[in-house]
């Protein structure tokens, strides 16, 4: 796994769940000065961060609000400044605030998140905006819900990026409203502005391999119906910028089989053409039971302060899966 990531020029901040660990030798000196300890917080799913003018701004999923953390050190979140920046007051988007992401676009701050009215079948993507220089100051205001297709299908896990002068949105959505089973796929579209799409959605990945379609945990616990998952897409570029990379998560997040897959496209190709994308047939990051790391996923990437490395944030569990009704034990 590590070799795959390095071949793609990604230098990751990865915990003991790497498949190929290098043992220390007597010629190596290990100090605590530049080390970190996982997990970074006791609890928290769907971690996401951005680095801007010497500060990291971090956020994670919640049930009913959005919190931002501000810190000089992304590995020291427990001592970061925190602020609640969004508490919804519209019943249609006041529940299950999943996978918030903060982006700096045209000198304004935007947070993308999914929310619903209490019924998770009604999840949609929303965008809020803050014109202040610091996102912990000023006020976020609702820009609206992103309508992702003409049928207004279920949509979560939105992320945005700019490539060669064009802004794109990538997200997880349903091909159509579920009946007896559910399939979650990765979509892409061009954007007119940070809260409006300018092209039709195009599916670039669906769960096809066995490792993408796991929904039953080893202890037999499962959802009420089959759910096959591709979700949480994240943009990255190869070192020489000749490839566009989309990391995404596969299989049910409630299982230990949750993992990270990879899509690639040539940088000069039409990113809204499904034929431009190729999928690796094995995950690039997955559970490591011997180290008690299960279901790693929901990646995001931030640079080190000196710009020499890239860090990957992700969540995982220390147990295979949570018992029904138990507190979510995922942590970043």
Indicate where each model-derived feature is located.
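Bacterial Sec-dependent N-terminal signal peptides
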Residues: 1-28
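Carbohydrate-active catalytic/glycan-binding domains of CAZyme proteins
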Residues: 18-332
């Amino acid at each position: 796994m590590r070799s795959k990531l390095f071949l793609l020029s990604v230098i990751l901040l990865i915990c003991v769940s790497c498949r190929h660990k290098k043992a220390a030798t007597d010629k190596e000196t290990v100090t605590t000065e530049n080390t970190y300890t996982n997990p970074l917080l006791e609890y928290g799913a769907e971690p996401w961060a951005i680095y801007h003018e010497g500060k990291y701004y971090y956020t994670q999923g919640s049930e009913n609000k959005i919190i931002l953390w501000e810190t000089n050190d992304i590995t020291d979140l427990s001592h970061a400044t925190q602020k609640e920046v969004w508490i919804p007051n519209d019943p249609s988007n006041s529940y299950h605030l999943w996978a918030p992401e903060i982006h700096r676009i045209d000198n304004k701050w935007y947070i993308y998140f999914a929310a619903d009215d209490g019924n998770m079948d009604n999840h949609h993507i929303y965008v809020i905006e803050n014109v202040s220089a610091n996102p912990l100051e000023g006020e976020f205001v609702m820009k609206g819900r992103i309508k992702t297709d003409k049928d207004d299908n279920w949509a979560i896990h939105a992320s945005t990026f700019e490539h060669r002068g064009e802004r794109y949105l990538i997200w997880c959505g349903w091909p159509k409203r579920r009946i007896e089973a559910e399939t979650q796929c990765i979509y892409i579209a061009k954007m007119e502005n940070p809260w409006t799409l300018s092209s039709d959605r195009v599916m670039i990945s669906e769960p096809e391999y066995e490792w993408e379609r796991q929904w039953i945990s080893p202890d037999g616990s499962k959802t009420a119906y089959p759910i096959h998952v591709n979700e949480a897409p994240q943009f990255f570029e190869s070192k020489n910028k000749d490839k566009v990379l989309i990391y995404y998560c596969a299989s049910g997040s409630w299982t230990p089989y949750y993992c990270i897959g990879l899509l690639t496209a040539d940088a000069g190709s039409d990113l809204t053409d499904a034929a431009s994308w190729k999928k690796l047939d094995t995950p690039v990051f997955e559970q490591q039971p011997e180290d008690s790391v299960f279901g790693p996923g929901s990646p995001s990437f931030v640079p080190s302060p000196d710009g020499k490395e890239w860090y990957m944030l992700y969540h995982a569990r220390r147990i295979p899966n949570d018992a029904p009704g138990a507190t979510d034990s995922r942590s970043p």
